[in-house]
């Protein structure tokens, strides 16, 4: 494969976009949510577990910044940190997600405690952050290109959730509305880095594997939630109904 001619930028972008067939919008858990078939517990479980992803995204982006010697890239990439953590004196995406939690009936302190985060979700998110720390900054930046498909998933929630789940406070949808514009902006930057960096066929094939790795992470998170909230088989379900799994080990 490494001896093959490289794809043109247009062909490479098309190959990247084709990976959208495996985006987690197609996972049965997501399909149930936007078709109105999810229970209150399933939506709350998704919000609680996804919060762990939200609070780790700034750490992923900080790792990219730490590994990146390109000042101009850093100047633009740092906006992602501000989007989630918030600028001084301002709320960011993390606070918006906490408000989403309140909107679906979760206590913010319980969300912050991460006591509801399933081990499978924690392992998947931790793998993503660890990849960003160890990979080259270009590879870590390119792994964010699941954002190519993100506007569609945010819009699907805005279109369907108010109709199917009137018990959710509409104020909680702020995060999805905000991310619509942010994700489109981030895609432009991430795609430009990717198309510029991967100019050999071997490099392009590696990038497609990296994007698949990120897709695997998102899909695996939902697999863990399906086990817990759809099949009623959370960790250790055969021996206890208690949430005995670890709540995060600080090193």
Curated annotation (Swiss-Prot):
Catalytic activity: 6-(2-amino-2-carboxyethyl)-7,8-dioxo-1,2,3,4,7,8-hexahydroquinoline-2,4-dicarboxylate + 3 O2 = pyrroloquinoline quinone + 2 H2O2 + 2 H2O + H(+)
Main EC class the enzyme belongs to: oxidoreductase
Record EC number: 1.3.3.11
Gene Ontology biological process terms from the UniProt entry: pyrroloquinoline quinone biosynthetic process; sulfur compound metabolic process
Keyword terms, alphabetized: Oxidoreductase, PQQ biosynthesis
InterPro entries, alphabetized: Haem_Oase-like_multi-hlx, PqqC, PqqC-like, Thiaminase-2/PQQC
GO molecular function per UniProt: pyrroloquinoline-quinone synthase activity
Pathway(s) per entry: Cofactor biosynthesis; pyrroloquinoline quinone biosynthesis
Record Gene3D superfamilies: Heme oxygenase-like
Task performed by this protein: Ring cyclization and eight-electron oxidation of 3a-(2-amino-2-carboxyethyl)-4,5-dioxo-4,5,6,7,8,9-hexahydroquinoline-7,9-dicarboxylic-acid to PQQ.
Family affiliation: Belongs to the PqqC family.
NCBIfam families: PQQ_syn_pqqC
The protein's name: Pyrroloquinoline-quinone synthase
Organism: Pseudomonas putida (strain ATCC 47054 / DSM 6125 / CFBP 8728 / NCIMB 11950 / KT2440)
